[in-house]
Amino acid sequence: MLSKELLAALNEQMNQEYFAAHAYMAMAAYCDKESYDGFANFYIEQAKEERFHGKKIYDYINDRGEHAIFDTIKAPKVEFSSILETFKDSLAQERDVTQRFYNLSELARNDKDYATISFLNWFLDEQVEEESTFETHIDYLTRIGDDCNTLYLYEKELAARSFNEQ
């Protein structure tokens, strides 16, 4: 059985994952509006991944005999000045999520809830990958700058991204 504090924190994180999916869809909409189809695809696939994370937490809460509680999801930011800004915002969001998982892990450790600690380790590993991915994209976009030809090729690469549940 999960402690009340840990259950509340897991429910909050589940909702945060669904907010992240909304935020990535807002970024996809910006990219589509600006005719960056490859970047839009990247963010659509990223949103699928975040929904998968939310469902994973939902399943865990229910598997532990508790009740997953859905809350109102606030509206995400919808206006951006550039593709680079979307990636910088994404990195900030992922860093916030990483900190949330650290806090969840600390709660689970304090509760000596070893099953939850094990469950959360998957997310901690995932967050290392997420942050690295966005840092790399920011580096590439910064180097590309205003080079339209290179940006076009990079966008085509991102158009091929496809999320596969693991």
Curated annotation (Swiss-Prot):
It catalyses: 4 Fe(2+) + O2 + 6 H2O = 4 iron(III) oxide-hydroxide + 12 H(+). It is found in: Cytoplasm. Keywords: Cytoplasm, Iron, Iron storage, Metal-binding, Oxidoreductase. Its main location: cytoplasm. InterPro entries: Ferritin, Ferritin-like, Ferritin-like_diiron, Ferritin-like_SF, Ferritin_DPS_dom, Ferritin_prok. SUPFAM superfamilies: Ferritin-like. GO terms for cellular component: cytosol. This is Bacterial non-heme ferritin. The gene is ftnA.
